[in-house]
Amino acid sequence: MGANHARIYAGMNAAKLVATADLDKDRCASIAEKYNVSTYTDYRELLEREKPDLVSIVVPTASHMAVAMDCLQAGVHVLIEKPITSTLDEAGAVIERARSEKLKLMIGHIVRFNPAVQELKKHLDAGELGRIFQIVCHREGPFPTRIRDVGVVVDLAPHDVDIMRYLSQSEPIRVYAETERRIHTEHEDLLLATMRFKNGITSALNINWLTPTKIREINVLGEKGMFQINDLTQDLYFYENSLAVNGIWDSLKTIQGVNPGKMVRFAFDRKEPLEMELTAFVEAVQNDLPVPVTGEDGYEALRIASALVQSGLTHQVIEL
C-alpha cells in the first residue's frame, strides 16, 4: 500500500515526492531507483533530514500512534491509513496532538473517494431515493498476509461503518455482531453484524477474510427503490420501485408493497480512489481547507468497530 502512495505522490503536479521510509531495505532500494528519491529505514531520520510538509503513514496499525505523534511533533501534516489507531485512547491522543499543533490530520477511508460512492451521495442528497430504509455492505475476500496485528473487524469494518455514517448522515445507536475465528486463530476472521441508526435506518455488514474471491458491494434500500454499488468495478445501479416513483405507494403498499420498475446504470468518470484521496489531502494542506475525512471520523469508525468486537465476544447488543 505504501508503494501506491509513493506512486501517486510522484505523479502529482501539486506535490513532490521527496523521500520514503521502510524497514525493508529491498523495498527502499526499489523505490529509490523507481522515483529517484531518498529512502530511509528510520522514518525519524527522514523527518529530521527532509523536513517534509506532509506525510502518509502506511504502517501496521499497532504503530500508527507512535509514528503519527512523531510526525506531528515535527510539524508535519499527517494522513493515516485506516484505522486511525489500535485503540480509542490512542486515537484521542493523536487527534488532540494535531489540534494543539494546528496541523491537518486526515484518515484514509478510501471508499469515500470511489467515484461510484460520490455519485451515489449526490443522488441521496437530492432525495432521489426518498426515505432510506437500510444500508447493507459486503466486504469479503481472502486473508491478506500483510495483516498480523488486528482482526477483520478493526481492519475492514471501519471502511463500511464510515460509509454508512457518510451516506446516512446519522450515527448508530446500537450494534449486534456475531464473529468467528474459523482459520486465523489469533483474531476473528468473520463478522456478521446489524446496526440501528438514530434516524431509523438499519444496516447490515457481512465481512470476512474467508471468501476465495473479492466481493465489495454497497446496497442502499429506500422508498423509491435501491441503489447498488460494486466497489471493485466502480459501477452504480438504481433499481426502481415503480409504485413509489409513480405516486401510488400509499394506496397500494398494503397489497403489493413494491413493484419492479426500470434499472439504470449510471455513467460517470472512473478514477483511482487513492489518487482522489491524496489529491484532496494535498489541496487541504496547500489551501488551508478542512480535510474531507477528519480524525473525529476515524475515531467514530474505530469506536463503532470496537463495539462490534465487544458484541461478538459477549454475544450482547451494545448501546452506543
Tell where the protein language model's regions lie, with residue ranges:
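N-terminal Rossmann-like dinucleotide-binding module
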Residues: 1-35
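Beta-loop-alpha module in the N-terminal Rossmann-like domain of NAD(P)-dependent dehydrogenases
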Residues: 5, 35-97
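C-terminal helix-rich "cap/oligomerization" subdomain common to oxidoreductases
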Residues: 54-59, 280-320
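A contiguous active-site-proximal alpha/beta segment in oxidoreductase catalytic domains
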Residues: 79, 85-147
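Oxidoreductase and adenylate-handling cofactor-binding alpha/beta cores
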Residues: 113-134, 154-180, 194-201, 311
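Contiguous beta-strand/loop segments that form the cofactor/metal-binding neighborhood of enzyme cores
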Residues: 161-241, 268-271, 275-289
